[in-house]
Swiss-Prot record:
Class of enzymatic activity (EC top level): oxidoreductase
Catalyzed reaction equations: pyridoxamine 5'-phosphate + O2 + H2O = pyridoxal 5'-phosphate + H2O2 + NH4(+); pyridoxine 5'-phosphate + O2 = pyridoxal 5'-phosphate + H2O2
Entry binding sites for substrate: R8, R9, E10, Y11, K67, Y124, R128, S132, R192, L193, H194
Lineage: Bacteria, Pseudomonadati, Pseudomonadota, Gammaproteobacteria, Alteromonadales
Amino-acid positions noted as binding FMN in the UniProt annotation, renumbered to this chain: 62-67, 77-78, 83-84, 106, 141-142, 186, 196
Protein name (database record): Pyridoxine/pyridoxamine 5'-phosphate oxidase
Comment on bound cofactor: Binds 1 FMN per subunit.
Alphabetized UniProt keyword annotations: Flavoprotein, FMN, Oxidoreductase, Pyridoxine biosynthesis
Domain of life of the organism encoding this protein: Bacteria
GO biological process: pyridoxine biosynthetic process
């Protein structure tokens, strides 16, 4: 087996030019997301890492799924009693990362997370499969449990409880809109001369800068 330090690869799938960039970053993100979804190389194109910090400044990361995006920002849903939600309540500044390795691309976002309204959350919740709706009631996310059987038992209880009719929205389940202050697009380049462009949100629009790799 080779050493990790011996692993090499070339990046040659594409490039990124300043004169081809739109004025608004979400236009480029939409294009890249569409290409990621159409690619057979990515199994979870909507998977993104979200980083938060606790009260001591310790950062944490985890993977969540992007459920929609617009000029306003990026939306995901989660348990409101989870560690990430508690940290967002303390410090709303977060960062997101879409690691589209097989396309030799990544998108890094900084911004602030804003809680969605109950109506907005409900609109999404009712579209989820019933099994997923029930699962939202089962897990006290980030709490310590003795065994997986604890979850299985609770799921069976909730499944029986909600066997008839609709599953109500848990009060502890919600979502966030991450309003971006910066969005960086990275495209792998030959000889490690990668293309990086940073969109910084200003008072009159977005400023675009090329960054050294």
């Amino acid at each position: 087996m080779s050493k990790l330090s011996d692993i090499r690869r070339e990046y040659s799938l594409g490039d990124l030019h300043r004169d081809a960039l739109p004025d608004e970053p979400m236009s480029l993100f939409s294009k890249w997301m569409e290409e990621a979804r159409d690619s057979e190389l990515l199994s979870d194109p909507t998977a993104m890492s979200i980083a938060t910090v606790d009260e001591s400044g310790q950062p944490f990361q985890r993977i969540v799924l992007l459920k929609r995006f617009s000029e306003e920002g990026f939306v995901f849903f989660t348990n409101l009693e989870s560690r990430k939600s508690q940290q967002i309540a303390h410090n709303a500044k977060v960062s997101l990362l879409f690691p589209w390795h097989s396309l030799e691309r990544q998108v890094a976002i900084t911004g602030e997370a804003e809680a969605l309204s109950t109506a907005d959350v409900m609109k999404y919740f009712i579209t989820r499969p019933k099994e997923s709706q029930i699962a939202a009631w089962v897990s006290q996310q980030s709490s310590k449990i003795s065994a997986r059987q604890v979850l299985e038992t609770k799921y069976a209880e909730m499944k029986a409880k909600f066997s008839k009719g609709e599953v109500p929205l848990p009060k502890f389940w919600g979502g966030y809109l991450v309003k971006p202050s910066s969005i960086e697009f990275w495209q792998g380049g030959e000889r490690r001369l990668h293309d990086r462009f940073l969109y910084d949100k200003g008072q009159s629009g977005w400023d675009i800068s090329r960054l050294a790799p």
